[in-house]
């Protein structure tokens, strides 16, 4: 005979059964370290790991998951790994790598993970943001139409850079690439542009010297220095560029202008090649992995000028009517001037122009050693100030004609008057384009120098006196025309009154003969 249960007994029975159930959730977010070598850790059993996820190892050590294989995960360790052993427990965190961002990083030197390394204590209030982010889409971008003044006559006149542009600085070692980048940072002192300098694979002494120079020139207050020195692991050198980009994007997203320098992407590509080979990925051309183009394209595409709508949407209406920009100056080091190597050609094709620095020009004393013939800025022309755009057209033509004629003049015994004048003008333009390091030049002074050479005022000045003449001219101009200088620097306009003032001022100064 079947036992009958009343409702109260049934509910009691169910409660008892529930209490007896032992919940033993299958742990799929833990794995076991099977090998540790050369900064690479292999982990068995992390079935739920995601690409680029942070993996927690013993002693608060983290690794970045890069290879997701059928039964194991290959990850690069961020930091020291001497304490890790085979059999250690590894856990997924569900987070991708993030770094601190915010205004409290300005004036500080941090490592690739955003930790301060300058001995000035902890960072102030910060937020965190992921190091990898999709670049702004086409709809959110605006055309480049505002200038970034480098302070170099040769660059601002012939190869202008705009806010939101990617302009490559390329050349052999010891041709002044870093010097040009640092001078550009110093020139942003009073422009409101925040700067991020990412040092990849450089000597610690070199980085310390750069930081000291920025401090001496009052430029560190608007700059974040991200340092991944040559003594640090390949993983940190690889990540540092993305970390710096994230710090720069913080300002772009909030309707401000930022400038980022990657010094240099050749060393980042070498670090990534090292990681890829250790992870046993198949090598391609020059032993680089197949995705080395994507390595740089996804980084440089994050530099952009974004619209007012983008900024308003990102800040949820807090910032209105402001565009933001992130301008990138990547640096590439070539070997014996070979710009057709794998990484240089990749980055040339990604960027909006390039500044070629040549060893021969550098050794000849022409510094910055810019080769005006093959340097180009594809979008910067629309961002030039009116006055420089109006005056600089003749500079490139004069230099091009001079280089062409100089080659023939070596074989010609006697030259006609026109050719001789073009050669002499070219010599003076070449001399005028020389500039010492840490001597940034304002728009007004650049315009005055270019006007003087274009109108022939330097034709009777000896070539070796051109720079002395220019220095005296600027000093005289600042003493007598302070209001006009401020007007030109603020507006960048060009009109007949300014031309008349330039003409009168140069003629007055020439009569003094005080150079």
UniProtKB/Swiss-Prot annotation:
E.C. numbers: 7.1.2.2
Chain sites annotated for binding ATP: 171-178
Catalytic EC class: translocase
Keyword Cell inner membrane found: yes
Keyword presence, Amino-acid biosynthesis: no
GO CC term (a single one): proton-transporting ATP synthase complex
UniProt keyword list: ATP synthesis, ATP-binding, Cell inner membrane, Cell membrane, CF(1), Hydrogen ion transport, Ion transport, Membrane, Nucleotide-binding, Translocase, Transport
One Pfam family named in its UniProt record: ATP-synt_ab_C
Site label Required for activity, positions: 375
Recorded GO MF terms: ADP binding; ATP binding; proton-transporting ATP synthase activity, rotational mechanism
Membrane topology: Peripheral membrane protein
PROSITE patterns registered for this protein in UniProt: ATPASE_ALPHA_BETA (PS00152)
Substrates-to-products reaction catalysed: ATP + H2O + 4 H(+)(in) = ADP + phosphate + 5 H(+)(out)
Entries under HAMAP family matching the protein: ATP_synth_alpha_bact (MF_01346)
Quaternary structure and interacting proteins, as annotated: F-type ATPases have 2 components, CF(1) - the catalytic core - and CF(0) - the membrane proton channel. CF(1) has five subunits: alpha(3), beta(3), gamma(1), delta(1), epsilon(1). CF(0) has three main subunits: a(1), b(2) and c(9-12). The alpha and beta chains form an alternating ring which encloses part of the gamma chain. CF(1) is attached to CF(0) by a central stalk formed by the gamma and epsilon chains, while a peripheral stalk is formed by the delta and b chains.
Family: Belongs to the ATPase alpha/beta chains family.
Function: Produces ATP from ADP in the presence of a proton gradient across the membrane. The alpha chain is a regulatory subunit.
Protein name: ATP synthase subunit alpha
UniProt lineage: Bacteria, Pseudomonadati, Pseudomonadota, Gammaproteobacteria, Lysobacterales
């Amino acid at each position: 005979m079947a036992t009958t249960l009343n409702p109260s007994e049934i509910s009691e029975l169910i409660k008892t059964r529930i209490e007896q159930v032992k919940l033993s959730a299958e742990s799929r977010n833990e794995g076991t370290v099977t090998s540790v070598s050369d900064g690479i850790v292999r982990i068995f059993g992390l079935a739920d790991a995601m690409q680029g996820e942070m993996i927690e190892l013993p002693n608060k050590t983290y690794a970045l998951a890069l290879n997701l294989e059928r039964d194991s995960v290959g990850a690069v360790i961020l930091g020291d790994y001497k304490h890790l052993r085979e059999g250690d427990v590894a856990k997924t965190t569900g987070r991708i790598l993030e770094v601190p961002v915010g205004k409290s990083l300005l004036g500080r030197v941090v490592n690739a993970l955003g930790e301060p390394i300058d001995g000035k204590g902890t960072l102030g209030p910060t937020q965190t943001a992921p190091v990898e982010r999709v670049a702004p889409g086409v709809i959110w971008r605006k055309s480049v139409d505002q200038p970034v003044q480098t302070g170099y006559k040769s660059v601002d006149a012939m190869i202008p850079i705009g806010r939101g542009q990617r302009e490559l600085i390329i050349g052999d070692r010891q041709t002044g690439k870093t010097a040009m980048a640092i001078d550009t940072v110093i020139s942003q002192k009073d422009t409101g542009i925040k700067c991020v300098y990412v040092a990849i694979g450089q000597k610690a002494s070199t980085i310390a010297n750069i930081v000291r120079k920025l401090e001496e020139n009052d430029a560190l207050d608007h700059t974040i220095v991200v340092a991944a020195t040559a003594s640090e692991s390949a993983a940190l050198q690889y990540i540092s560029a993305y970390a710096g980009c994230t710090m720069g994007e913080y300002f772009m997203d909030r309707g401000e202008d930022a400038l980022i320098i990657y010094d240099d992407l050749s060393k980042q590509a070498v670090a990534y090649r090292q990681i890829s080979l250790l992870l046993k990925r198949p090598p391609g051309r020059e032993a680089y992995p197949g995705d080395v183009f994507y390595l740089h394209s996804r980084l440089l595409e994050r530099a952009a000028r974004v619209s007012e709508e983008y900024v308003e949407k990102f800040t949820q209406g807090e910032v209105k009517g402001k565009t933001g920009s992130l301008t990138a100056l990547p640096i590439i080091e070539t070997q014996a001037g070979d710009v057709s190597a794998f990484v240089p050609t990749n980055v040339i094709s990604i960027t909006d122009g390039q500044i070629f620095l040549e060893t021969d020009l550098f050794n000849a004393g022409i510094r910055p050693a810019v080769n005006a013939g093959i340097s180009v800025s594809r979008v910067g022309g629309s961002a030039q100030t009116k006055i420089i755009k109006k005056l600089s057209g003749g500079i490139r033509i004069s230099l091009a004609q001079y280089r062409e004629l100089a080659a023939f003049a070596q074989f010609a015994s006697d030259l006609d008057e026109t050719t001789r004048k073009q050669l002499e003008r070219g010599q003076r333009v070449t001399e005028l384009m020389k500039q010492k390091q840490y001597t940034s030049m304002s728009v007004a002074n650049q315009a005055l120098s270019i006007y003087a050479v274009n109108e022939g005022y330097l034709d009777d000045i000896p070539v070796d006196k051109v720079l002395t003449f220019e220095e005296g001219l600027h000093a005289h101009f600042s003493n007598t025309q302070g209001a006009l200088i401020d007007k030109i620097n603020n507006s960048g306009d060009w009109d007949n009154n300014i031309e008349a003032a330039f003409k009168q001022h140069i003629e007055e100064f020439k009569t003094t003969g005080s150079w």
